[in-house]
Amino acid sequence: MSGLKQELGLAQGIGLLSTSLLGTGVFAVPALAALVAGNNSLWAWPVLIILVFPIAIVFAILGRHYPSAGGVAHFVGMAFGSRLERVTGWLFLSVIPVGLPAALQIAAGFGQAMFGWHSWQLLLAELGTLALVWYIGTRGASSSANLQTVIAGLIVALIVAIWWAGDIKPANIPFPAPGNIELTGLFAALSVMFWCFVGLEAFAHLASEFKNPERDFPRALMIGLLLAGLVYWGCTVVVLHFDAYGEKMAAAASLPKIVVQLFGVGALWIACVIGYLACFASLNIYIQSFARLVWSQAQHNPDHYLARLSSRHIPNNALNAVLGCCVVSTLVIHALEINLDALIIYANGIFIMIYLLCMLAGCKLLQGRYRLLAVVGGLLCVLLLAMVGWKSLYALIMLAGLWLLLPKRKTPENGITT
């Protein structure tokens, strides 16, 4: 067990996972799914949850039996050795320069909607968000969990308020009959919606900080997954009911438009604040997870700067290093005005590759029906890589490159290189 402070309970874990899954997607993905699949997207959410369940269960069982700040990298190391563990860790960290600045831009975009910010003002908002992540992170996982549980409650409250004010009744939900489902539209929606469930790998890094990881980590993961899926489905119903989607409308503008329609322009700030907090929650759990991964990877040298914990058993040095990388990436991307859309797709391929490595580790570490679920999850990950298409080559090249280029490490006990 790691030296990190064990302070997370079940409710806090549910709040952490549900907000990490909702994140930037809750304001945008339901509108995108409605655009590509129409009413078929109402069936796509339960189908997607069923497909993700094998992967989630494998994460839950591995996290219960092998809780570690190393997350997926730790599972892979136990199954295939320390070299692939390091490769997996660096593969996860390689998302920092692309994924986090993109999420920062989305979060700062709500400031643009509220105050008309542009250019340097948005940059200051992004840097301010990182400062807030640092402040919360130095207070420990419990502080992050408490905040994100509140954010999860606000997101749910917003959707419930829209349902109530919009007088949406179950009889009004336009569920297509099973025989009328268009498979082409369903598959198109699934390919868009999968990214809402990227976040399980980040949550795995917090398993060792639960008070009772064997009992509460799997429960938090499964309940958080179902809660996030229910919120996404509820958002999709709202978007379809108010016809708040289209090729000429920004996907992230759908819920704010509905809020203004129901509650007036004065309520726009409510949607923007909740949207910002949802983005912040996703950013926060990823940055805290990256910090714990960096800390765990530095444990081969306990005297290393990054391997040290604060007096409160928090990896502050690793957190500072991760945030430093985020600041540099944000400044470079702002200066060069880089378009991140294509790069995010490449990053998504890396996430699927990490999921696949976790499933392969599960095939080796687990027994019985859980091993079978790991096999099913692995096949689903291969299918998802195929759906990404040729852009998945980026993840494969990164994996091969890290395997070849990472220097071999000598273990002090026997001098064996890994």
Swiss-Prot record:
It comes from Escherichia coli (strain K12). Keywords: Amino-acid transport, Antiport, Cell inner membrane, Cell membrane, Membrane, Transmembrane, Transmembrane helix, Transport. Its main location: membrane. Residues 1-15, 63-89, 135-147, 204-219, 279-317, 363-378 are periplasmic. Residues 37-41, 111-113, 169-182, 241-257, 339-341, 400-418 are cytoplasmic. This is L-methionine/branched-chain amino acid exporter YjeH. Belongs to the amino acid-polyamine-organocation (APC) superfamily. Amino acid efflux (AAE) (TC 2.A.3.13) family. InterPro entries: AA/rel_permease1, APC_superfamily. GO terms for molecular function: antiporter activity; L-methionine secondary active transmembrane transporter activity; neutral L-amino acid secondary active transmembrane transporter activity. Induction: Induced in the presence of intracellular L-methionine, L-leucine or L-isoleucine. GO terms for cellular component: plasma membrane. The lineage of its organism: Bacteria, Pseudomonadati, Pseudomonadota, Gammaproteobacteria, Enterobacterales. Catalyzes the efflux of L-methionine, L-leucine, L-isoleucine and L-valine. Activity is dependent on electrochemical potential. Efflux of L-methionine is inhibited by the proton ionophore carbonyl cyanide m-chlorophenylhydrazone (CCCP). It catalyses: L-methionine(in) + H(+)(out) = L-methionine(out) + H(+)(in); L-leucine(in) + H(+)(out) = L-leucine(out) + H(+)(in); L-isoleucine(in) + H(+)(out) = L-isoleucine(out) + H(+)(in); L-valine(in) + H(+)(out) = L-valine(out) + H(+)(in). It is a multi-pass membrane protein. Pfam families: AA_permease_2. It comes from the Bacteria. Changing G25F: Strong decrease in methionine efflux.
